[in-house]
Amino acid sequence: MKTIITLIFSVFLLFQLSAQNNQKQKVTHLPVIDMHVHVSKVRPGSGPLCPWFLSNMPGADPNEEFNFANVMKSDCMDPLPAATSDEEMKNEITGRIIEKNMTLVAFGDPGIIRSWMAEVPEGRIIPGISPGKLTVEQFRDSLESGFYKYMSEVAPQYSGMSPSDMSLDPYFAVAEELGIPAGIHMGTGGNGMTNITNSKYRASLGDPFLLEDLLARHPKLKICVQHAGYPMIDNMLALMGANAYVYVDISGMIWSYPLDDVHEYIKRLVRAGFGKRIMYGTDFMTWPRMIETSMGVIEHAQYLSEDQKRDILFNNAARFFRMDKSQFDWPEGK
């Protein structure tokens, strides 16, 4: 009799746990794709961050020590706290992936990327890889392995190079041949990047027009101009008009520069007819709540229709990666 009672109780618990699990997995959010997530070990001592911290850049003098605390402000009403450990970061990010029905395009430390992937449903993290110090053969092997789906983040601007520099051309040729899209950093790098942080950096090398020779050599290469070439909107629009496979992500600028200017930049892209080629992204690094902050910029943009918001938050990126929308989780009735 005791055995039967134990068996019945065990079956009851099994059904209860199954019901709870199904309830937890119930989808309530429309899918979102974040095109720009950096993955690395947590840096000890990282402080909190105020969104749109570059809204009032400090005056500075070369005879005075430059204090980054004056730029990376944390004196606002609700600063974003930094993750304090790799485990905390993993839990914060994978929890958001599930809760907010997100897919992240992530690049950086492959070991950490794999550990995140193990915690979320299949396909919810899309790994990217930059050529970095890889030979062309090593880069090809990495892409042909099937693990990496994106060539990113390619950032020659920080090395004082144009994206059309011929030293990079064999890597882009491999991506074009294999049908792998590429993400290229173009635009600003932050306050004092050249004279304080990186003497090789040149603002002029973020000009979207510098992509023209690359695109002419590789007409079937699909690219994402990361950070949307901010603040060079006129050249960005002209490049997109001349090249049908150029998309942009609005990462980085979306949480750092003055919010009014960010909205105006996005508005210009939409007004010029490129609403189908703008993709949401955070340029995520250290602060988990940056995801909600960045997403809110699009969700609360009154100049965007609901269809335009869905294009930016999901549809355009799904098309960019040639994804089947039926493979995503959707709320009931959607």
Where do the model's predicted regions map?
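Mid-to-C-terminal alpha-helical segments outside catalytic/metal-binding sites
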Residues: 3, 19-78, 91, 274-277, ...
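Bacterial N-terminal signal peptides
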Residues: 6-16
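Active-site gating/metal-coordination segments in enzymes
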Residues: 21-25, 109-193, 200-202
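A cross-domain feature marking catalytic cores of carbohydrate-active enzymes
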Residues: 37-39, 106-109, 129-131, 152-156, ...
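Active-site environment of divalent metal-dependent phosphoester hydrolases
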Residues: 40-42, 111-114, 134-135, 159, ...
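Aromatic- and acidic-residue-enriched segments that line the glycan-binding/catalytic groove
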Residues: 45-58, 119-125, 198-203
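Divalent metal-dependent hydrolysis catalytic cores, especially in the metallo-beta-lactamase
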Residues: 50-87, 92-111, 125-130, 149-153
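Catalytic pocket-lining loop regions of alpha/beta-barrel enzymes
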Residues: 149-150, 164-279, 331-333
